[in-house]
Amino acid sequence: MHVTAKPSSFQCNLKCDYCFYLEKESQFTHEKWMDDSTLKEFIKQYIAASGNQVYFTWQGGEPTLAGLDFFRKVIHYQQRYAGQKRIFNALQTNGILLNNEWCAFLKEHEFLVGISIDGPQELHDRYRRSNSGNGTFAKVIAAIERLKSYQVEFNTLTVINNVNVHYPLEVYHFLKSIGSKHMQFIELLETGTPNIDFSGHSENTFRIIDFSVPPTAYGKFMSTIFMQWVKNDVGEIFIRQFESFVSRFLGNGHTSCIFQESCKDNLVVESNGDIYECDHFVYPQYKIGNINKSELKTMNSVQLTAQKKRIPAKCQQCAYKPICNGGCPKHRITKVNNETVSYFCEGYKILFSTMVPYMNAMVELAKNRVPLYHIMDVAKQMENN
């Protein structure tokens, strides 16, 4: 089980054009800050429901708005309830509030920090803006430099939209240049209707927002970056999507929930203790309990698991079904013969067709006990052939 905690709910100090939390303000009427009793109950139950290694993820909105004193209490309660278990903390942030005091705290308590950044300035500032409409690039870069000066481990999260999707190498080389060793690319899709479950909808009952990334462009973007990575950066740069497929091909299963067979065990706890089945499905019908009233260990993603397992006939017949599993239920909005398939289907096929030969080559390397970074030599040979 993994639970993402949202101590400040949907609240944020930025107003990014594409943020799906902008619609949440009218939905939530509960207290927007996690109080002490809810925090304590969550930490106690989550540690009890976890194995010997417990991974906490703090997200938003913008979690740093909860304040440093809140996170000092996080450490206090974790230490109280950890017993012999080892605790890990990850913080996903826009970086705006990361001053010296924050960075010293994050270093002292060994937080892994995820920084949201969408590429070089002209690409990042296209959608990631302040409440006053100004670009945020300079402040984010300053935060990254401050993290580096305090030797805080960080990674990057990049939202692929209709603009930066056309600049894969510029984005990739930029992220490398700022010192990102671990990268995650999120494909952006938002509709005019809150994206819940389109399986029962008729065609054309929704519109795709302009900033969403076109499927084939996304596939080409990721394929271009994959080829750069597989020829030059394996073992040095870690890209979440690619690492997930390496894990899958080596027989260990996907590490990315999008392509897993089930949606179970990726829950969200809201600031008032409400538990939802997924970060992308924080809607009333997907609420499964409250940490202050129910036992966390008894909760699971029943509805999403059912949606995930409703694999359309088109997917069942696809050669990539074993490694794709129909993609994320959030993305299943494209009608095919009265069924809904992933909006990103054609893009995924472009990426899979690029990756699979190299993944198979990695499997052969592993069988022969050859370090996987040797795929870079193999990849160059394959390209020359």
Swiss-Prot record:
Amino acids binding [4Fe-4S] cluster 2: 257, 263, 278, 328
Keywords, alphabetical: 4Fe-4S, Iron, Iron-sulfur, Metal-binding, S-adenosyl-L-methionine
Binding site for S-adenosyl-L-methionine: 18, 61, 116, 128, 189
UniProt-listed InterPro entries: 4Fe4S-binding_SPASM_dom, Aldolase_TIM, Anaerob_Ser_sulfatase-maturase, rSAM, SPASM_anSME, Sulphatase_maturase_rSAM
Binding site for [4Fe-4S] cluster 3: 315, 318, 324, 345
GO terms, molecular function: 4 iron, 4 sulfur cluster binding; metal ion binding; oxidoreductase activity
Cofactor-binding details, from the entry: Binds 3 [4Fe-4S] clusters. The first cluster is coordinated with 3 cysteines and an exchangeable S-adenosyl-L-methionine.
Domain Radical SAM core: 1-231
Biological process according to GO: DNA damage response; protein maturation
Record-annotated active site: 279 (proton acceptor)
Binding site for [4Fe-4S] cluster 1: 12, 16, 19
Similarity remark: Belongs to the radical SAM superfamily. Anaerobic sulfatase-maturating enzyme family.
This protein's name: Anaerobic sulfatase-maturating enzyme homolog YdeM
Organism: Escherichia coli (strain K12)
